[in-house]
UniProtKB/Swiss-Prot annotation:
The gene is phzA. It comes from the Bacteria. Gene3D superfamilies: 3.10.450.50. GO terms for biological process: antibiotic biosynthetic process. It comes from Pseudomonas fluorescens. This is Phenazine biosynthesis protein PhzA. Belongs to the PhzA/PhzB family. Involved in the biosynthesis of the antibiotic, phenazine, a nitrogen-containing heterocyclic molecule having important roles in virulence, competition and biological control. Keywords: Antibiotic biosynthesis, Virulence.
């Protein structure tokens, strides 16, 4: 399993780190119609998805066919989506990277009015020899609700010492 490499800190497996980092960088730079081929960055049984859902269960797309279909849907529903302020963080495992970024673009999700979304994201990438085995995406679900025109509930935080 790629996640089980023994760690020698950040100075081990340098070529593997470089190769995996290049894949993560390419994923985060992929825009427009190029997203229709983004599934090619994954292993044949790789998966990607959102870990912020109303069910509490991740929404996962596994395998090239499902990831390709997701790419088509994303291109239709978020036609000009771009990641920016991208910061990639290596870990002591050369096959695992974290990314912090902002995302923005038009929303054209069926069943909701056209809108615009800006949100902050955390991405986890697990890789095997330059191919993504798992990509997990985390974001602020309240910003997603706002972008879709869904009323956001007010959370009472009485007594919390926030400024």
């Amino acid at each position: 399993m790629p996640g089980s490499l023994s760690s020698g800190g950040f100075n081990d497996h340098l070529e593997l780190r470089r190769k995996n980092r290049a894949t993560v960088d390419q994923y985060m730079r992929t825009n427009g119609e190029d997203r229709l081929r983004r599934h090619e960055l994954f292993t044949p049984d790789g998966s990607g998805g959102s870990w912020n859902t109303e069910t509490g269960e991740p929404l996962v797309f596994k395998g090239h066919a499902k990831l390709a279909a997701l790419g088509v849907w994303l291109h239709q529903c978020f036609p000009d989506w771009q990641w920016h302020n991208v910061r990639v963080f290596e870990t002591d495992n050369p096959n695992h990277f974290w990314v912090e970024s902002d995302g923005r673009g038009t929303t054209r999700v069926p069943g909701y009015p056209e809108g615009y979304c800006e949100n902050h994201y955390i991405h986890s990438f697990e890789l095997d020899n330059g191919k993504i085995t798992q990509n997990r995406e985390f974001m602020n679900p309240f910003e997603q609700l706002r972008a879709l025109g869904i009323p956001v509930p007010k959370i009472k935080r009485e007594g919390i010492p926030a400024s």
